[in-house]
């Protein structure tokens, strides 16, 4: 663990263990970076457990290669640094030179090499007279030491390893190490950074759960966003790995790649929204979001080591602008940044909650939708997902212009998904818009596509015509006050441990709402209620909707207050990550549209322990 970010350096491991526990407590998992190919040139452990020998401690430095060594050496040759020693500092001395991390096997790495790192020796002699040779029997020293390191961190109750440059380490080691680690920690996840697509299957067989699909899907989608290749090319890249698609990790940003909104990519985070929708929704495999991507982080700072290169520095202590504003004072975010985050939140939530996305089958529609007046495969991409009786049609638009499109659904899709030919009512999960589709084999479904976005239409193929009939609402509520009611319910649940209100009258001029509490709130607690409400309103949390059936209600969501004749399809209203509740009423799009929350007064009934709040919102 990094002593620079410890509160108490001597107890930093205890701090790490407590951090892991806190992360697990809020329902998240911990994946740590494991760098198996190289270490820092000056590496040495300062806290080896008793009986453990450090990397290189027992090496024979007079041998360029030995399967018993942990490093490679240049016997009799000192290390020659490719950059000058800063004024006032002592020159770095290393004799004999260790070989450099990016497979540079002499003592004079260039400025473009990884000269600050040294290559670990896994039993491969890269400079054998007859070419590369392999020495895996007996098991090389580095294999056992690196496996012990994995086991040590696995014992800290983490959930997985992201393995840096995994393909620079022989797959035979990974088979050895993952078998041992997963034997003791069966749920441990291994994520590998592999760039050679021809090696994907080898590393999957070696125990990796997921592989970065950089050279495949990332490069493809990036080029589509930048208008360098057609959207229809997506088909080739998923088909190329169709047998291992569930092992592909999709992404549009990571620490090695340029930021989407940077001048080096496309200059605008919005342009990647259709690519994000495709990457997150077309398969059951994971999609990774890099911190700040959801706000459209520019990555255009000229940091000390890396300079202005469109990436967020990984070498310097630095303040990332959107993260500072987005996570510490949302009032400083621009409206465009808030809108972009809301889209990411919507799509990622449905990717994890809609069974058709996280469990369902996939059908690519591009082969029956060539260039036509109503469809342009250069900027449009369409596919279906299905689970049981739920079908979702996703159509995205990489263009800067709004388009009216017609999407052909072939007879084969009807046969594959066992879909009936009939009218269905569909709802757009992004906008809550409802429409009717006439489903026919080889028929066309028409829709309007906004620029740099898409439509996500969900419908049921049950033969009975229930589809998305929701119960009629018994009153026309004032949306700002109605959303405030949801927000207030969660505030009271968290502050007082009570149930959500069962008695509320929500109106435009003023509203009343009651809670059963174990004590009468003090004046300070009443003030805290109002303060918390206005704090949440100022955070401008997005208000989003999703549709689920009764058998797939998310954990923690109660539907016991719905009427007995409530429909099978339930609409959930989410307010950021703060609240989720079944509801069919009208709401604002984000909490800032509520306006100011004003607590008008309270009443306490000591006999029933009922606490009534009178409030109004001032948009």
Question: What would you call each of these model-derived segments?
Answer:
Residues 463-619:
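Active-/binding-site microenvironments in catalytic and ligand-binding cores
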Residues 253-254, 259-423:
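Loop/helix patches that line or flank the sugar-binding groove of alpha-linked glycan CAZymes
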Residues 437-463:
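C-terminal beta-strand-rich structural cap/linker in extracellular carbohydrate-active enzymes
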Residues 1-13, 117-142, 158-168, 218-225, ...:
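The substrate-binding groove and active-site-proximal loops of carbohydrate-active enzymes
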């Amino acid at each position: 663990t990094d002593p620079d970010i410890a509160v108490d350096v001597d107890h930093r491991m205890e701090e790490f263990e407590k951090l892991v526990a806190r992360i697990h407590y809020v329902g998240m998992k911990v994946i740590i970076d494991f760098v198996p190919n190289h270490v820092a040139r000056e590496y040495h452990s300062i806290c080896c457990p008793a009986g453990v020998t450090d990397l290189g401690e027992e090496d024979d430095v007079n041998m360029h290669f030995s399967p018993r060594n942990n490093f490679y050496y240049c016997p009799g040759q000192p290390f020659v640094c490719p950059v000058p020693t800063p004024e006032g500092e002592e020159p770095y001395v290393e004799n004999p030179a260790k070989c450099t991390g990016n497979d540079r096997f002499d003592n004079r790495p260039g400025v473009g090499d990884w000269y600050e790192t040294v290559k670990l020796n896994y039993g491969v002699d890269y400079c054998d007279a007859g070419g590369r040779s392999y020495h895996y029997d007996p098991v090389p020293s580095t294999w056992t030491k690196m496996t012990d390191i994995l086991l040590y961190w696995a014992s800290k109750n983490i959930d997985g390893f992201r393995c840096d440059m995994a393909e620079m380490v022989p797959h035979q080691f990974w088979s050895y190490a993952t078998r041992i680690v997963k034997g003791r920690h069966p749920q441990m996840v291994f994520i590998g950074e592999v760039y050679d697509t021809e090696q994907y299957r080898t590393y999957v067989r070696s125990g990796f759960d997921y592989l970065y699909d950089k050279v495949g899907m990332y490069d493809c989608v990036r080029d589509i966003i930048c208008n360098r290749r057609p959207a229809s090319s997506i088909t080739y890249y998923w088909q190329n790995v169709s047998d291992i698609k569930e092992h592909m990790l999709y992404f549009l940003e990571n620490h090695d790649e340029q930021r989407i909104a940077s001048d080096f990519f496309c200059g605008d985070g919005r342009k990647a929204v259709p690519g994000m929708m495709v990457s997150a929704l077309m398969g059951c495999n994971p999609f990774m979001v890099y911190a700040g991507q959801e706000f459209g982080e520019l990555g255009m700072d000229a940091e000390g080591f890396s300079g202005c290169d469109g990436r967020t520095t990984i070498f310097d202590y630095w303040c990332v602008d959107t993260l500072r504003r987005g996570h510490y004072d949302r009032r400083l975010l621009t409206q465009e940044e808030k809108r972009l985050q809301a889209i990411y939140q919507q799509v990622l939530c449905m990717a994890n909650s809609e069974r058709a996305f996280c469990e369902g089958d996939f059908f690519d529609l591009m082969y029956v939708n060539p260039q036509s007046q109503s469809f342009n495969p250069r900027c449009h991409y369409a596919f279906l997902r299905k689970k049981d009786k739920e079908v979702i049609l996703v159509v995205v638009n990489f263009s800067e212009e709004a388009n009216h499109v017609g999407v052909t659904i072939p007879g084969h899709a009807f046969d594959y998904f066992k879909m009936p030919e009939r009218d269905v009512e569909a709802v757009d999960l992004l906008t809550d818009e409802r429409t009717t589709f006439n489903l026919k084999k080889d028929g066309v479904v028409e829709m309007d596509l906004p620029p740099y976005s898409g439509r996500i239409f969900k419908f049921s193929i049950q033969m009975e015509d229930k589809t998305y009939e929701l119960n009629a609402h018994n009153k026309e509520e004032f949306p700002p006050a109605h959303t405030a009611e949801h927000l207030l319910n969660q505030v009271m649940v968290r502050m007082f441990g009570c149930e959500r209100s069962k008695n509320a009258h929500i109106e435009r001029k003023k509203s009343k709402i009651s809670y059963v509490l174990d004590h009468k709130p003090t004046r300070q607690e009443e003030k805290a209620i109002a303060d918390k409400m206005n704090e949440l309103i100022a955070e401008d949390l997005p208000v989003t909707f999703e549709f689920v059936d009764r058998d797939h209600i998310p954990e923690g969501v109660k539907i016991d207050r719905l009427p007995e004749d409530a429909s099978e399809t339930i609409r959930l209203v989410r307010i950021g990550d703060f609240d989720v509740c079944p509801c069919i009423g009208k709401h604002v799009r984000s909490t800032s549209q509520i306006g100011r929350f004003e607590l008008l007064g309270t009443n306490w009934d000591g006999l029933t322990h009922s606490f009534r709040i009178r409030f109004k919102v001032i948009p």
